[in-house]
Swiss-Prot record:
Residues 13-181 form the PPIase cyclophilin-type domain. Belongs to the cyclophilin-type PPIase family. Transmembrane segments: none annotated. PPIases accelerate the folding of proteins. It catalyzes the cis-trans isomerization of proline imidic peptide bonds in oligopeptides. Keywords: Cytoplasm, Isomerase, Rotamase. This is Peptidyl-prolyl cis-trans isomerase A. Homodimer. It comes from Mycobacterium tuberculosis (strain ATCC 25618 / H37Rv). Pfam families: Pro_isomerase (PF00160). The lineage of its organism: Bacteria, Bacillati, Actinomycetota, Actinomycetes, Mycobacteriales. It catalyses: [protein]-peptidylproline (omega=180) = [protein]-peptidylproline (omega=0). It is found in: Cytoplasm. It comes from the Bacteria.
Length: 182
């Protein structure tokens, strides 16, 4: 991507993902040089160009995977998690892939985009955005992007403070309406 630094304000960015949610847009710089398989997976699912074997968040067998998905787990001061088409925390695309850890990417600041998983090599479609430093996650979750502007960070913060039930699920759904990649 030409001159991506001026677009994303991140020297690591290879593309930008904009999550259009019912609470506002979240712009994220994607780190394709540091986590190429993870970024390719996310972009492919977002655009509907990557095959998957489960129903997407809209209930279909093909097309953009994340459109209509909710942030199903929100923990104030920690993170917001989405990307599960079922909204339960147990769904995914029907496949798993390996972690990609890069020494330049550490959970040493908020607003990092990373893969949610159930242990080594179990990445699929679920992701989270941190709202604080989370060094205990280093080498456990693949970091593949960062929220890049103050307005997007405010949206993430607002989502992180939304009311939740006893299972950390927002009582008023936070919906990913669509994702655009540029």
């Amino acid at each position: 991507m030409a001159d991506c630094d001026s677009v994303t304000n991140s020297p690591l960015a290879t593309a930008t993902a904009t999550l259009h949610t019912n609470r506002g847009d979240i712009k994220i710089a994607l780190f394709g040089n540091h986590a190429p398989k993870t970024v390719a997976n996310f972009v492919g699912l977002a655009q509907g160009t990557k095959d998957y074997s489960t129903q997407n968040a809209s209930g279909g067998p093909s097309g953009p995977f994340y459109d209509g998905a909710v942030f199903h787990r929100v923990i104030q001061g920690f993170m917001i998690q989405g990307g599960d088409p079922t909204g339960t925390g147990r769904g995914g695309p029907g496949y798993k892939f390996a972690d990609e850890f890069h020494p330049e990417l550490q959970f040493d600041k908020p607003y990092l985009l990373a893969m949610a998983n159930a242990g080594p090599g179990t990445n699929g479609s679920q992701f989270f955005i941190t709202v604080g430093k989370t060094p205990h996650l280093n080498r456990r979750h693949t970091i593949f992007g960062e929220v890049i502007d103050a307005e997007s960070q405010r949206v993430v913060e607002a989502i992180s403070k939304t009311a939740t039930d006893g299972n950390d699920r927002p009582t008023d759904p936070v919906v990913i309406e669509s994702i655009t990649i540029s």
